[in-house]
């Protein structure tokens, strides 16, 4: 792995990143240091990008069953700028507000990117959460139907954003489970 040119982050940039994210100054500096170690040689960190493979290989994401979706949602055309990485870390931080976490969870779980979490999406979510590819079709349908019966308020066999938001607002574990400590900061 290459290294960026060792430019220190400007004080003004650090203040701006703090104002625009839910990250502390130390977390931003820690992420900056990690980014510098991963980015291509000879690039200034604001001009450098990381691939989805580089980001998904970070220890905190490597074990996440949704790492491919997380990377897809937060990257731009499969590449991560430093600001993309900061945005991702901010959403998954403990300080991020519930509405922001719910918005990004919806985007991550909308596998087919049709603006809804439909039966196909729910089945993929269930299989990934249970780490199971050999679940019986009947059990998978039962679990999918149970989720829909609890959350699909208009009975159209899919969750709109507002239905998903309503369901997550009632879930006491959501805020605790939608956190990732990427950088060991």
From Swiss-Prot:
UniProt cross-references to CDD domains, sorted A to Z: EFh (cd00051)
Residues that hold Ca(2+) 2 according to the record: 152, 154, 156, 158, 163
A matching Pfam family: EF-hand_7
The EF-hand domain, residue ranges: 62-95, 97-132, 139-174
Keyword Metal-binding set for record: yes
Binding site for Ca(2+) 1: 110, 112, 114, 121
Keywords from the UniProt entry: Calcium, Magnesium, Metal-binding, Repeat
Statement: the UniProt record of this protein carries the keyword Repeat: yes
Extra facts: The binding of either calcium or magnesium may significantly increases the structural stability of the protein in comparison to apo-CIB (calcium- and magnesium-free form).
Protein name per Swiss-Prot or TrEMBL: Calcium and integrin-binding family member 4
Protein's organism: Homo sapiens
Highest classification ranks of the organism: Eukaryota, Metazoa, Chordata, Craniata, Vertebrata
């Amino acid at each position: 792995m290459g290294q960026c040119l060792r430019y220190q982050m400007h004080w003004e940039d650090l203040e701006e990143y703090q104002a625009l994210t839910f990250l502390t100054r130390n977390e931003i500096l820690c992420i900056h240091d990690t980014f510098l170690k991963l980015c291509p040689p000879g690039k200034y960190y604001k001009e450098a990008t990381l691939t989805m493979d580089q980001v998904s290989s970070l220890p905190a994401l490597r074990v996440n069953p949704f790492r491919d979706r997380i990377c897809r949602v937060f990257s731009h055309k499969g590449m991560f700028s430093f600001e993309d990485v900061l945005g991702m870390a901010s959403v998954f931080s403990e300080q991020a507000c519930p509405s922001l976490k719910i918005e990004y969870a919806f985007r991550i779980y909308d596998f087919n990117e049709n603006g809804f979490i439909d039966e196909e999406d729910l089945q993929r979510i269930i299989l990934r959460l249970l780490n199971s590819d050999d679940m019986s079709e009947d059990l998978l349908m039962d679990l999918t139907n149970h989720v829909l019966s609890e959350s699909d308020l208009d009975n159209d066999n899919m969750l709109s954003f507002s239905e998903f938001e309503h369901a997550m607002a009632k879930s006491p574990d959501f805020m605790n489970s939608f956190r990732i400590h990427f950088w060991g900061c």
